[in-house]
Design a protein with these regions (language model features):
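Metal-dependent nuclease catalytic cores that hydrolyze phosphodiester bonds in DNA/RNA
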Residues: 1-111, 118-134
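An active-site-proximal "capping" alpha-helix that borders the catalytic cofactor pocket
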Residues: 132-143
Length: 144
């Protein structure tokens, strides 16, 4: 995907995004790709070299990466931070990186996925977006 800067954001934003390449590890498909439309996933894979995205449209993603980096440094006892897990479903290796797992004495764990978003998103989705719920459910399936 080609990165543009049509809105003239400061160069460090562009440099960060150019260096910040997502990896799904050894997985054939990531949880975040799986919760998206299959058609969108296929088209993004097929036309990745032709697609363009402006760095201004990635501001929440950039802020999210910064928040994740900060929270990664605060690993408390009985927690696992930013662990990538894999599981096979239907002959495909699915991978996902869980932001925080809190381990409980009874052997269970609580999964947390941090989100940075706008106030409007929360105003119109007080329970969270459906894809966020789907993402956590897939993480839970992989973590089992």
């Amino acid at each position: 995907m080609k990165l543009t800067n049509r809105h003239g954001l400061p160069e460090p934003f562009v440099m960060f995004e150019e260096a910040n390449k997502y990896s799904r590890g050894g997985a054939e498909i990531s949880v975040t790709s799986l919760i998206d439309s299959p058609q969108i996933f296929r088209l993004k894979e097929q036309y990745s070299e032709e697609l363009e995205e402006d760095v201004a449209d990635r501001i929440f993603s950039i802020l999210g990466t910064a928040v994740h980096a900060i929270l990664e440094t605060a690993e408390a006892p009985d927690t696992i931070v930013e662990e990538r897990l894999y599981a096979e479903f239907g002959g495909k290796l699915i991978g996902g990186q869980i932001d925080l797992q809190t381990l409980h004495k009874n052997g269970t764990r609580t999964l947390t996925d941090y989100k940075t978003t706008s106030a409007a998103t929360i105003r119109y989705n007080p329970e969270g977006k459906r894809e966020w719920v789907n993402q956590l459910n897939l993480y839970a399936a992989i973590a089992r």
